[in-house]
Amino acid sequence: MSNAAPRPLDGITVVSLEHAIAAPFCTRQLADMGARVIKIERPGSGDFARGYDERVRGLSSHFVWTNRSKESLTLDLKRDAARGIMQRLLEQADVLVQNLAPGAAARLGLSFEALHEKHPRLIVCDISGYGVGGPYQDKKAYDLLIQSESGFLSVTGTAEEPVKAGCSIADISAGMYAYSAILNALLLRQKTGAGSRIDVSMLESMVEWMGFPMYYAFEGAAPPVRAGAAHASIYPYGPFPVGDGGTIMLGLQNEREWRVFCAQVLRQAELAEDPRFLGNSLRTANREALRALIVEAFSGLTVQQVTDRLEDAQIANARVNDMAGVWAHPQLRARERWSEVGSPAGVIPALLPPASSNAFAPRMDPVPAVGQNTDQVLASLGYAPEEVAQFHAQEVV
């Protein structure tokens, strides 16, 4: 697809007071779709996610993941001159996104209520741990804390202890809902002509994802047990060791697959009629006995041999990849899902957005250095070179 094809959000300007993951993940997706995203950062240090690690040639892995295709503008919003720049910026903006500490945006005069009269078409998206209102609205919130508060940890891990997800799923979920809500607000503005306020709670985003375990524990019923990497209520569905030291992940969904699995994979057709395993509920209740039988059947086989049997039987399966395996994944390569973007550390690989379109190519522009675009953004707002120089001298930017 030609990069010249128009993108859905061409002409949309987003200003973001963002840090960490939730808001940057939201706005990076807006940038992918063509929006101009101006990222407001602290002069000197920038977004504190820049300092999380130095794994990407000296850059932070979190930061390069969530900040491509953005412009970095440094502003010290404690200074009057910087707040004046911000107001001028908002005159040209369609969307303001912020995930500052609770109450910080309001103290800066950047709440929807403070801005709506002067900027009636502006969409304001606030992302916070617990949302506005309620006893937790001022409580600090980080990804792991929300995983815990939402009940996610209670159903994740082993029987002995809970385990967090290996990536920032609470931040990601909030960022995804913020992104879709902004698209909805832009569509609504086409009908009403007015901007609107969006309130995204990390807690509520994660609780939405907890629908299955919540309903499983409906009206005081016992919740799903923690089952490690295996499914809590479907069996066999999870990882199994293989004779060559590898691990295979497999999943059965119905009784037809169970019979095929016994006959063609385990090559023990009679096991399908074992009264201990008649139906998923009994297989789940007797999972330890069934697991021992499966492990024994796989003990003389390699991962490839087990995979071949599962494929021939059309039983869903997967290898347990590490990160090197994902970088080299043949499916991603075959579908040409890797692109490249610039960065302060040079050109780096970047995964294309998962939803590909035949109508346009996503925007894949560089990850900015701190304040890299400050002078250009100020010039686009009408500030003369001598004014820009004065802002630098006064440490406004």
Residue spans of the language-model regions?
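N-terminal helix-loop segment corresponding to the beta1-alpha1 unit
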Residues: 1-191, 369, 375-397
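Terminal low-complexity tails and localization/encapsulation signals of metabolic enzymes
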Residues: 1-13, 241-243, 325-397
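Glycine-rich beta-alpha junction loops
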Residues: 44, 130-131, 202-207, 244-246, ...
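Short Gly/Pro-enriched turn/cap motifs at secondary-structure boundaries
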Residues: 63, 227-232, 238-239, 250, ...
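Conserved Rossmann-fold dehydrogenase catalytic segment
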Residues: 132, 159-169, 190-206, 225-232, ...
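Oxidoreductase and adenylate-handling cofactor-binding alpha/beta cores
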Residues: 175-195, 208, 212-219, 262-268, ...
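Aromatic-enriched alpha-helical interface/lid elements that frame and gate functional surfaces
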Residues: 236-313, 317
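Conserved PLP cofactor-binding pocket of PLP-dependent enzymes
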Residues: 311-332
